[in-house]
Design a protein with these regions (language model features):
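Enzymes that bind and transform nitrogen-containing heteroaromatic metabolites
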Residues: 2-36, 52-53, 71, 163-165, ...
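Proteins enriched for Cys/Gly/acidic motifs involved in redox and nucleic-acid/cofactor modification
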Residues: 31-35, 61, 124, 135-169
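Zn2+-dependent cytidine deaminase-like catalytic core
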Residues: 42-144, 288-290
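Active-site beta-strand termini and strand-to-loop segments that position acidic
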Residues: 45-46, 158-159, 345-347
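Structural motif corresponding to alpha-helix initiation and N-cap regions
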Residues: 62, 94-95, 121, 143, ...
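Short, well-ordered, mixed-charge alpha-helical segments that flank or form enzyme active sites
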Residues: 90-92, 117-121, 143-147, 172-177, ...
Length: 349
């Protein structure tokens, strides 16, 4: 049964609006939930008014459903729980969300994505057997949830490795530096602001030894005034060259890793159970991940300038002829000041 199978157009409209709200809420959990999924949930009271909203807390904290149900209190009884991921049916550091929904007395549950984790799946069936009206979201909402904040977690569950995004900033002709090596700044402040926001949403930022030596980046997430933000990714340098003790990337918070390998697959394995890895540079590192078939997503920040010469955004991607090109589909585009932002995922067919 899907959400559209219900008889009430007004109810469907409210549920669609609430599920869209839950999807937005789930984004607020990005960067803090690993190894758990970033989930959003909304509770409607029996009259259809919003009674509670929530997103997944850090590991050991409450799941999104529990946050929303706690906020709703007695208003949840006889109401509807809408959630971006099937309620878990697993006792871990926290109890099953299916049991919490039953205890709250909800009459209906609508979820978007089926839980692919065999340890946690089954919440929908448990609720259904207990007499709760359970429905799956419509196909467009399922697709939005799967391509939204859950995409890295789902990829980790299905493939056994982290979701990898290659991010770069370049000119219209694909240059990341001029012939003299100058590169600050190719893109404008709006693009840089966007990048720092993205760093807060992922688990690890990786650069190669060459970029570390050339630019001495800190790889931190910063606000517009340069101050570090509350959410910080793990910072990693990949390559066999030792990272000096005074390198900016080391920082002082202990959130640094040296991945002493040239093999992208081995580097990902060294990172453990992280969900989302952001590969920021340089060209050889990007080429190595592309050649290994390990780039799932590309985020490009393109400045409206042409250099003609200089360093290319990628080198050694393992492509000898046009038919072997790495293909991607545009999922999102935006204008950031004078720049253009593109988010693309790997083409599967």
């Amino acid at each position: 049964m899907t959400m559209s199978d219900g008889p009430d157009d007004g109810r469907r409209r409210r549920e669609r609006e609430s599920l869209a709200d839950a999807l937005t809420l789930s984004r607020s959990a990005l960067g803090i939930t690993t190894p758990n999924p970033p989930v959003g949930a909304v509770v409607l009271d029996p009259a259809g008014a919003v009674a509670g909203r929530g997103a997944t807390e850090a590991p050991g904290g409450r799941h999104a459903e529990v946050v929303a149900l706690d906020a709703a209190g007695d208003l949840a009884r006889g109401g509807t729980l809408l959630v971006t991921l099937e309620p878990c049916d697993h006792q871990g550091r926290t109890g099953p969300c299916s049991a919490r929904a039953l205890a709250a007395g909800v009459a209906r549950v609508v979820y978007a994505v089926r839980d692919p984790n065999p340890l946690a799946a089954g919440g929908a069936e448990t609720l259904r057997r207990a007499g709760v009206d359970v429905a799956r979201a419509d196909d467009d909402e399922v697709a939005a949830a799967e391509q939204g904040p859950l995409r890295a977690w789902l990829h980790r569950q299905r493939s056994g490795r982290p979701y990898v995004t290659w991010k770069y900033a370049a000119t219209l002709d694909g240059r990341v530096a001029a012939a003299d090596g100058s590169s600050r700044w190719i893109t404008g402040p709006e693009s840089r602001h966007h990048v720092h926001g993205r760093r807060q949403e992922i688990d690890v930022v990786v650069v190669g030894s060459g970029t570390r030596a050339a630019d001495d980046p800190s790889l931190t997430a910063r606000s517009d005034d340069g101050a570090p933000t509350d959410r910080q990714p793990l910072r990693a340098v990949m390559g066999l060259t030792p990272v000096p003790p005074d390198a900016a990337v080391r920082g002082s918070d202990g959130r640094f890793r040296h991945l002493a390998t040239r093999d992208p697959a081995e580097a990902l394995a060294m990172l453990g159970d992280v969900q989302h890895v952001l590969v920021e540079g340089g060209p050889r590192l990007a080429g190595a991940f592309l050649a290994a078939g390990l780039v799932d997503e590309v985020e490009a920040y393109l400045a409206p300038i042409v250099l003609g010469d200089g360093r290319s955004a990628v080198q050694g991607a393992g492509v000898g002829t046009l038919t072997d090109a790495h293909g991607f589909e545009v999922r999102e585009n935006a204008t950031l000041g004078r720049d253009v932002y593109l988010r693309m995922t790997r083409r599967t067919a």
